[in-house]
């Protein structure tokens, strides 16, 4: 039988804090389970809810002005959530409520509340690029890679998009300007900043505080719309989280990276926003085409890829002086696949100080082999490259997360060979190594190519783990 803590002892400050928070005298079990949370609970209790309500209303007015909800509804939702613990008796749910309320109390003002105050002046830093001149070249390159055979029976795992994406995009544009040391963007929106003819959906971001930001944003959307918002963590995408509404519609996603990784990601500054250097993005696109699913996307909408490719080609031409004359030298580098052991050997001696690169298609095998080498100089760039790199005894060791396309039995398709070369060049860019000659040869190797059919492809590495999620409505955190 539950008993109340002894009321005859001297006044217990911790007891009073918990009692005030719960709106009732805690049971013995509640007291002993929650007493270590007393500091967080006190912060929640003294938190100025009126100021918080005002900030959410201002966020609504600026970014969600077309959402039909009243100021009183927003206030009621906020006050209801901050008193939810008074009607909750499950210890696990109480811990979840305390954790999420603590995030709002300690971070919301600095992360999203700040977006409501006057912004610094935007420093216009756009360069005029002649993208049109690259469109025909991009079309030729992409046409030679448009070799996927679409299986009409295959169910594609594309997400449904929430109607709130346009509102969140407006918020994200301001967020990227205010928090440009901790959040940068890549993908179609970043290229749109260079070329306004590019269409974009949601805004792709890398940040150093992804979980906190997404929790704050999820609550902002919940308080404004009244909808249940769910945060999901996908095991096979490293440090990735996504916000979806109660109907499983995609709102925004984010990859989290360490600050030291953020510091070395090549980036450029446009209108107070940092974007991943388009050179780096171009290499990632070349790497991406080794993935059979991406080639299927290319087959369905080549023009979408064409305008992006042309934009990045013009950027590297302008920035690095790349001459597109078909001079390819030793590109793509020679690649030999061991299908049984799932390792591709890339001959790199013509371009780099290490003579070859062993590319593993199974990450766990690479990790085991690195341990056997007893080498502690590996570089982990997290989701930026989806791989660890190690150079040991003039050999690079790395992991490749995409499929490997074959043009014949035991023969690496040139699309994948270029993807592997691009993967190595990502390392060179991240470590300030030499890459421009190799980049020039790689891009020129994509010119004037005939289509080569795909014979087969390797399967992607299967990632273990379970899905994690935060369900605000049900007070559940599973990670």
UniProtKB/Swiss-Prot annotation:
Polymerase that creates the 3'-poly(A) tail of mRNA's. The keyword ATP-binding applies. Ca(2+) 2 binds at residues 202, 204, 253. Induction: Expressed in the early phase of the viral replicative cycle. Ca(2+) 1 binds at residues 202, 204. InterPro entries: PolyA_pol_cat_Poxvir, PolyA_pol_cat_sf, PolyA_pol_nucTrfase_Poxvir, PolyA_pol_nucTrfase_sf_Poxvir, Poxvirus_polyA_pol_cat_C, Poxvirus_polyA_pol_cat_N, Poxvirus_polyA_pol_cat_N_sf. The active site is at residues 202, 204. This is Poly(A) polymerase catalytic subunit. It comes from the Viruses. Heterodimer of a large (catalytic) subunit and a small (regulatory) subunit. Its EC number is 2.7.7.19. The gene is OPG063. Pfam families: Pox_polyA_pol (PF03296), Pox_polyA_pol_C (PF12629), Pox_polyA_pol_N (PF12630). GO terms for biological process: mRNA processing. Keywords: ATP-binding, Calcium, Early protein, Metal-binding, mRNA processing, Nucleotide-binding, Transcription, Transferase. The keyword Methyltransferase does not apply.
């Amino acid at each position: 039988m539950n008993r109340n803590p002894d009321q005859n002892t001297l006044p217990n400050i911790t007891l009073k804090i918990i009692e005030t928070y719960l709106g009732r005298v805690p049971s013995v079990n509640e007291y002993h389970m929650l007493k270590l949370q007393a500091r967080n609970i006190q912060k929640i209790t003294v938190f100025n809810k009126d100021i918080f309500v005002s900030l959410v209303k201002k966020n609504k007015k600026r970014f969600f002005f077309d959402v039909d909800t009243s100021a009183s509804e927003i206030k009621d939702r906020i006050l209801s959530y901050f008193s939810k613990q008074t009607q909750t008796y499950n210890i696990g749910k109480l811990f979840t409520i305390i954790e999420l309320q603590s995030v709002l109390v300690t971070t919301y003002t600095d992360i999203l509340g700040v977006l409501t105050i006057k912004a610094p002046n935007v420093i216009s830093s756009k360069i005029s690029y002649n993208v049109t001149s690259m469109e025909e070249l991009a079309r030729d390159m992409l046409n030679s890679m448009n070799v996927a055979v679409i299986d009409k029976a295959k169910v594609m795992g594309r997400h449904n998009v929430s109607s709130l994406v346009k509102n969140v995009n407006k918020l994200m544009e301001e967020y990227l300007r205010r928090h440009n040391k901790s959040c940068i963007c890549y993908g179609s929106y970043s290229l749109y900043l260079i070329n306004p003819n590019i269409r974009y959906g949601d805004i792709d971001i890398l940040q150093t505080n992804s979980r906190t930001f997404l929790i704050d944003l999820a609550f902002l959307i919940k308080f404004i719309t009244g909808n249940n918002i769910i945060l999901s963590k996908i095991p096979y995408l490293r440090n990735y989280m996504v916000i979806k509404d109660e109907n499983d519609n995609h709102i925004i996603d984010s990859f989290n990276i360490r600050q030291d990784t953020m510091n070395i990601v090549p980036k450029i500054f446009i209108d107070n926003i940092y974007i991943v250097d388009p050179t780096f993005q171009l290499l990632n696109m070349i790497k991406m085409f080794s993935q059979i699913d991406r080639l299927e996307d290319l087959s369905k909408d080549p023009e979408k890829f064409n305008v992006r490719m042309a934009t990045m080609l013009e950027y590297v031409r302008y920035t690095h002086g790349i001459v597109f004359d078909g001079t390819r030298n030793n590109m793509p580098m020679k690649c030999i696949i061991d299908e049984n052991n799932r390792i591709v050997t890339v001959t790199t001696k013509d371009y780099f100080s290490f003579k070859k690169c062993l590319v593993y298609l199974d990450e766990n095998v690479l990790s085991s082999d690195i341990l056997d080498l007893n080498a502690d100089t590996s570089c982990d760039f997290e989701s930026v490259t989806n791989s660890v790199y190690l150079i040991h005894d003039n050999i690079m060791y790395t992991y490749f997360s995409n499929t490997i396309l074959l043009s014949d039995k035991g023969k690496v398709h040139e699309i994948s060979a270029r993807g592997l070369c691009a993967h190595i060049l990502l390392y060179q860019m991240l470590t300030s190594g030499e890459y421009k000659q190799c980049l020039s040869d790689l891009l020129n190797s994509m010119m004037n190519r005939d289509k080569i059919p795909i014979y087969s492809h390797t399967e992607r590495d299967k990632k273990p783990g379970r899905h994690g999620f935060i369900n605000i409505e049900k007070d559940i955190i599973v990670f």
